[in-house]
Amino acid sequence: MAGSHPYFNLPDSTHPSPPSAPPSLRWCQRCQPSDATNGLLVALLGGGLPAGFVGPLSRMAYQASNLPSLELLICRCLFHLPIALPLKLRGDPLLGPPDIRGRACFCALLNVLSIGCAYSAVQVVPAGNAATVRKGSSTVCSAILTLCLESQGLSGYDWCGLLGSILGLIIIVGPGLWTLQEGTMGVYTALGYVQAFLGGLALSLGLLVYRSLHFPSCLPTVAFLFGLVGLLGFVPGLFVLQTPVLPSDLLSWSCVGAVGILALVSFTCVGYAVTKAHPALVCAVLHSEVVVALILQYYVLHETVAPFDITGAGIVLGSIAIITARNLSCERTGKVEE
């Protein structure tokens, strides 16, 4: 009878049976990644990997022409302003809907502060260590804030991957914190680590505020506001706190252009990913930035990479694999049960 056939689930056997899907199609449907997995993959490939180049390239620009951090940040903000064109063509308000315009501007401000702290820290702290502290603090703060404000918990595998990535970061940066030089140089280095930590805190707050924004053009609006707020805040600060420098060599201009493009790609991908997956997991996957920065730190900047750095980077990569594999396996299980 039709009711006993495994492909039928109709109460009346007189109804026509639905056509069965080919085995290959059913297999593809079962193995289709979930939204969370898609978000984590976008954060890994489009957010973490390009961002890993930003710190070393910023340091190269500083070493080549003493380019101030605020000037580099201003150049990066300029790459966000052309986003106003597609917003205008679609008829969307540049600053967002009036009822949530304040939150959108606050989200952009938090992102500007986070990037500003990161750029300042990388001038006095090795690029890999600065990225390590910033990403570690953003992960911890995101987990705590999301748990307290959104009551969104994590599974055991997620916590395992999250804590493993934080352990890897501690292994990377821990020995350097215990060997800070005494005197003025040691103070500057310590302040660099503090700035990196504050940058991670601002990043986690910015991600949570961004998740609370719900309107169609949310991502391009926040990206445009990032450029606008950055220019309004840091152009005066550049002339007050630092001395503007006009790069005269091709290397500096190339680094500035690459930083602007890669940072814009990373910003967009992270904004997409955080709407699909838990903010703490997104921040944990973004730890791939640290691994890329360490590789460039050794091969391009010719700075020392200790065995602790290699060990910590391996643990970070393993933790990212656990988080991604767990989300993919959950989606497969859910499709099979259906």
Swiss-Prot record:
The keyword Membrane applies. Keywords: Membrane, Repeat, Transmembrane, Transmembrane helix. Its main location: membrane. It is found in: Membrane. Residues 1-21 are annotated as: Disordered. Residues 49-174, 272-325 form the EamA domain. The keyword rRNA-binding does not apply. It is a multi-pass membrane protein. The chain crosses the membrane at residues 37-57, 67-87, 105-125, 160-180, 190-210, 221-241, 250-270, 281-301, 305-325. One of its GO terms (cellular component) is membrane. PANTHER family: ACYL-MALONYL CONDENSING ENZYME-RELATED, SOLUTE CARRIER FAMILY 35 MEMBER G5-RELATED. The gene encoding this protein appears to have arisen by SVA-mediated retrotransposition of the SLC35G6 gene in the primate lineage. Belongs to the SLC35G solute transporter family. This is Solute carrier family 35 member G5. It comes from Pan paniscus. The gene is SLC35G5.
